[in-house]
Amino acid sequence: VTDATPTAGPEEAVRVLRDDHERLLTVVGQCATAVTAEWDGDSVTDRERVVPPFRRALDGSGALSRLPRALADAVTATGRPMAAPPVAAPPYVVVTGEGVVLRANLGDGRLVVLLRAFEVDRGGDGDGDSDGDGGDGGDSEPHRYRRIDGVEIEAEIV
């Protein structure tokens, strides 16, 4: 018999978010949809038309302040300790052009969860080799942001 707490993988974090925070995920999706209602078409190339309004919508809906609790529950589901209680600000909760990134330092790594609400077409020549530093592709296509259907959850422990 051992006193060690069993640990689970990131799939348990995803399960807890889906099962226990379904309403929060719905609100995140509604906020993303509200952002796209201000666009002229189904996509935009200006990150400023995605991230700041998405953050304002999340804050105004109360979702932003509820995300740290969801992150804490996701960490608990992995069976790992969290270094500090999360707050609704970086580095724990970050609103990006793809959605919301939740991060928590664990005893043996970091849990990173993406609540993806947008896809980002990074433009360029499509060969997938770009590292995003500009390189020699001075006139590459701008990033294009599109709303995806629903909110996808991706999680990993790194």
Predicted regions and their residues:
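Acidic, polar-rich N-terminal leader regions of halophilic archaeal proteins
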Residues: 1-158
